[in-house]
């Protein structure tokens, strides 16, 4: 890697984790206890990279709200001198994930409020400011505006990745595991302009249409 580092773009999210007694049936009540705030979304990757090597420049591109959660995210990133937050736009309400963890089973259930993160778009990305060796975008299928169709590139995200390549950056993407058939509409166009793609087995099945496992386990013939 050269000295220009890595740019990470996408969903900047605040996570609030609660412990609950049990997950309630519809219409019923349960107690929520011990809320703990964490950074989520691309924040975790950014901080991990900054910790991994303090000499690697890390640049951020995304949207947070002009609110307490947005300031929490910005402050958490400011703790690392090799993280450049000039590419963060403040607007509206910060995206928040509320995670409910059952006390006994430790099973987690997630409630996501996207806030204005869905409005993150190519016009808010200053490629001259965030020029790097690698441009990483996540999460496809959770990007709102960038997941929308584009006449020339297939999706807005694909256009962003193509632009990053024009600035001589290698491109990388990650996505969320989603039920449904949006993978081919949203992910396929982006892959044309992607050098590195990170997927799990659920996402791999969604993208390729090849079933990797069923109720009986892994389908060895498709591996």
Question: Language-model features: where?
Answer:
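Ribokinase/PfkB-type carbohydrate-kinase core domain
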Residues: 1-14, 71-89, 96, 101-223
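Glycine-rich phosphate/adenosyl-contacting loop at the front of the ribokinase-like
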Residues: 1-63, 68-78
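Alpha-helix N-cap/helix-start capping motif
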Residues: 43, 67, 92, 201-202
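Short beta->alpha junction loops/turns
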Residues: 63-66, 91, 176
């Amino acid at each position: 890697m050269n000295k220009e580092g890595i740019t990470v773009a996408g969903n900047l999210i605040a996570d609030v984790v609660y412990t609950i007694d049990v997950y309630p049936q519809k219409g019923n009540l349960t107690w929520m206890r011990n809320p703990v705030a964490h950074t989520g979304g691309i924040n975790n990757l950014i901080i991990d990279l900054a910790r991994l090597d303090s000499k690697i420049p890390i640049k951020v591109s995304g949207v947070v709200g002009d609110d307490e959660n947005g300031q929490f995210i910005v402050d958490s990133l400011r703790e690392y001198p090799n993280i450049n937050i000039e590419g963060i736009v403040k607007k509206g309400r910060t995206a928040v994930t509320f995670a409910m963890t059952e006390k006994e089973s430790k099973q987690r259930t997630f409630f996501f409020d996207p806030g204005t993160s869905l409005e993150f778009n190519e016009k808010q990305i200053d490629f001259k400011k965030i020029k790097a060796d690698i441009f990483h975008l996540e999460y496809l299928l959770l990007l709102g505006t960038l997941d929308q169709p584009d006449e020339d590139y297939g999706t807005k995200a694909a256009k962003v990745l193509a632009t990053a390549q024009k600035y001589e950056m290698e491109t990388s993407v990650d996505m969320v595991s989603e039920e449904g058939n949006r993978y081919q509409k949203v992910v396929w166009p982006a892959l044309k302009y992607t050098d590195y793609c990170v997927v799990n087995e659920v996402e791999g099945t969604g993208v390729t249409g090849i079933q990797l496992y069923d109720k009986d386990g892994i389908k060895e013939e498709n591996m």
